[in-house]
Amino acid sequence: MPDLYAYTDGACSGNPGPGGWGVLMLAREGEAVVKERTLQGGEVLTTNNRMELMAAISALEALTRPTEITIVTDSAYVKNGVTTWIHGWKRNGWKTADRKPVKNAELWERLDAAQQRHKVVWRWIKGHAGHAENERADELARAGMAPFKTR
């Protein structure tokens, strides 16, 4: 059975501004890629953090059955949020430790629901540091943003 990876990225022109998200999904047997799928999308007025979340959500929602997957993101916001902060937010009724509403709560709730049926390993990598798969995800995110940018 191949190992499944999703490399996710978000992009925004202005923050807020037009934005996009991209996902490179790879099925690997050892070092060999046996299947590849790309996803992308965007919005006219959004933030970089929202696009990073949408990339991860879209990767998980694209899976048609319960799956073991490694999601690789260059967003510390997504990685820390989904592996650490979310537990307290849920306990506090989607409020932060200082009782303020969690930003992007509807996307965090969607991500939380999307990951429930899968076995997800979350991995953070440094962005724009020469990781080929992350660079592809960035290209997809920029392509997802392109239709929403005005010249």
From Swiss-Prot:
Binding site for Mg(2+) 2: D9, D138
Cofactor or coenzyme needed: Mg(2+)
Location of the RNase H type-1 domain: 1-146
Compartments in which it is found: Cytoplasm
Gene Ontology process terms (BP): DNA replication, removal of RNA primer
Cofactor comment: Binds 1 Mg(2+) ion per subunit. May bind a second metal ion at a regulatory site, or after substrate binding.
Alphabetical UniProt keywords: Cytoplasm, Endonuclease, Hydrolase, Magnesium, Metal-binding, Nuclease
Keyword Metal-binding tagged: yes
Gene3D superfamilies in the cross-refs: Ribonuclease H-like superfamily/Ribonuclease H
Catalysed reactions listed for this entry: Endonucleolytic cleavage to 5'-phosphomonoester
UniProt cross-references to CDD domains, sorted A to Z: RNase_HI_prokaryote_like
InterPro entries associated with the record: RNase_H (IPR050092), RNaseH-like_sf (IPR012337), RNaseH_domain (IPR002156), RNaseH_sf (IPR036397), RNaseHI (IPR022892)
EC number(s) per entry: 3.1.26.4
Similarity comment: family membership: Belongs to the RNase H family.
Function: Endonuclease that specifically degrades the RNA of RNA-DNA hybrids.
Subunit annotation: Monomer.
Entry protein name: Ribonuclease H
